[in-house]
């Protein structure tokens, strides 16, 4: 596993959820290993391959399981033991286990009654937030996977939770609903709620999350904004695509710079490898101008969560 510095230790004064050296194991399997991280207001994306410990962490945060060592605190209290703090956390699980005989409206009202929500309009507001009112009286057994996900999100929101934990909430949603749910989650985070979202669709997390935590083998591999994490990897090669009228001439000139480790000509254009991306960015245009070469595009190839994630799990 690639070892990276944690660029944002995340133990700010406004942290709502704190995980302090928490370990969880099931028999001989270690699911979390001395994990230390925290979550505050806004949206945090939780990334990692299968078996990384994401769902275990979410279950510990919501109090569904305890930790074997260390501590998990939500608003300074133990979510496993404190019923008051449990009521302030809502979970949308990844699994599709829903009472299929209920309608969406009945599901949301059931959750509202279970939590003692007395506002008679709360269920309608929650259904409206996820665009479920037109289908609210249809039974869940007839819903698509994406519609069931939206019904579960509505059920979670009916309690107006300060802490919202979402395990793959966009799974099965159509493109329009993905956009709407993404906007909703960002709005909830902007309101000051702590929103924790796991997803395997890294490009969606990139659009959704203010911060990213990457778990590998139950440990925290990286934390912070994805660009900040990439900046912390400045001792590792980065790749920049340059499209120009005369790529061979430009590549030869760039190779003479101390900022470039290598160049290769591909169908997409000239790919430059560098460990000093900032210096390269400042040098490309002057070199092209001196050569009389027209630049058409200069774009980093590895400045996305997808490429970052691949490098982290190598």
Explain the meaning of each model-derived region.
Residues 2-7, 276-314:
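C-terminal coupling/interaction segments
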């Amino acid at each position: 596993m690639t070892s990276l510095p944690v660029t944002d230790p995340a133990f700010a004064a406004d942290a709502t959820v704190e995980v302090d050296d928490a370990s969880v194991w099931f028999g001989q399997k270690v699911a979390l290993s001395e994990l230390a991280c925290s979550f505050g207001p806004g949206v945090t994306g939780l990334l990692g391959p299968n078996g990384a410990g994401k769902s275990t962490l979410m279950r510990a945060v919501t109090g569904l399981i305890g930790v074997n060592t260390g501590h998990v605190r939500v608003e300074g209290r133990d979510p496993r033991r404190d019923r008051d703090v449990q009521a302030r956390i809502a979970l949308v699980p990844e699994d599709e286990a829903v009472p299929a005989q209920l309608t969406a409206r009945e599901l949301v009202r059931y959750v509202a009654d279970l939590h003692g929500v007395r506002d008679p309009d709360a269920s309608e507001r929650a259904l409206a937030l996820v665009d479920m009112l037109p289908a609210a009286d249809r039974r869940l057994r007839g819903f698509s996977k994406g519609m069931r996900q939206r019904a579960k999100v509505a059920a979670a929101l009916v309690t107006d939770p300060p802490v919202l934990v979402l395990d793959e909430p966009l799974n099965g949603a159509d493109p329009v609903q993905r956009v709407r749910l993404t906007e909703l989650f960002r709005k909830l985070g902007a309101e000051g709620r702590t929103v924790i979202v796991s997803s395997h669709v890294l490009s969606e997390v990139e659009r959704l999350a203010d911060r990213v935590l990457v778990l590998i083998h139950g440990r925290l591999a990286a934390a912070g904004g994805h660009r900040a994490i990439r900046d912390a990897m400045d001792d590792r090669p980065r790749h920049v695509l340059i499209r120009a009228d005369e790529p061979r001439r430009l590549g030869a000139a760039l190779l003479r710079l101390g900022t470039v480790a290598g160049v290769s000509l591909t169908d997409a254009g000239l790919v430059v490898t560098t460990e000093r991306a900032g210096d390269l960015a400042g040098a490309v245009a002057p070199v092209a101008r001196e050569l009389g070469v027209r630049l058409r595009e200069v774009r980093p190839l590895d400045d996305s969560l997808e490429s970052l994630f691949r490098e982290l799990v190598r």
